[in-house]
């Protein structure tokens, strides 16, 4: 599989300190079937990082609300020494441990889990404020697009 031809990768937010809350850009999933929200946490302080997903009716964040249907979550607890993904309990959010490790967290979201009946087809990842020594970055990896949204 050629990742650049079979997926659409979009930056949610670039690397930044977690001393303040971080909100990723909203992505329109109207013509997609699935998105993996990938968050990298370089944890430099023993403060947990709370991650959430919100849905909206437009990429401006119109009517934003938390997702309500639990989605599969995967974790690499120490990405500096391992590349093994471990399935976590399905949930609508995830909070990291306080361990000083580089972590990868993936939310697997089928677009059907969004409130599409009420027009919610946009998604955003958010990180609550933790500590400035915690550096975070996130991407959306979209699959199953009928055609690319611009």
Residue ranges and their predicted role:
Residues 1-150:
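Surface-exposed, low-hydrophobicity beta-strand/loop segments enriched in small/polar/acidic residues
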């Amino acid at each position: 599989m050629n990742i650049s031809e079979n997926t659409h990768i979009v930056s949610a937010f670039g690397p930044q300190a977690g001393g303040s809350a971080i909100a990723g850009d909203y992505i329109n999933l109207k013509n997609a079937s699935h998105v993996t929200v990938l968050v990298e946490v370089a944890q430099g302080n023993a403060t947990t990082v709370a991650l959430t997903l919100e849905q909206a009716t437009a990429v401006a964040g119109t009517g934003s609300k938390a997702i309500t249907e639990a989605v599969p979550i995967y974790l690499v607890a120490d990405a500096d020494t391992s590349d093994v993904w471990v399935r976590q309990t399905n949930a609508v959010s995830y909070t990291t441990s306080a361990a000083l490790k580089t972590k990868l967290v993936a939310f697997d979201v089928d677009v059907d889990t969004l409130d599409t009946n009420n027009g919610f087809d946009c998604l955003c990842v958010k990180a609550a404020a933790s500590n400035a020594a915690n550096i975070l970055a996130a991407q959306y990896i979209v699959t199953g697009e009928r055609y690319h949204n611009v």
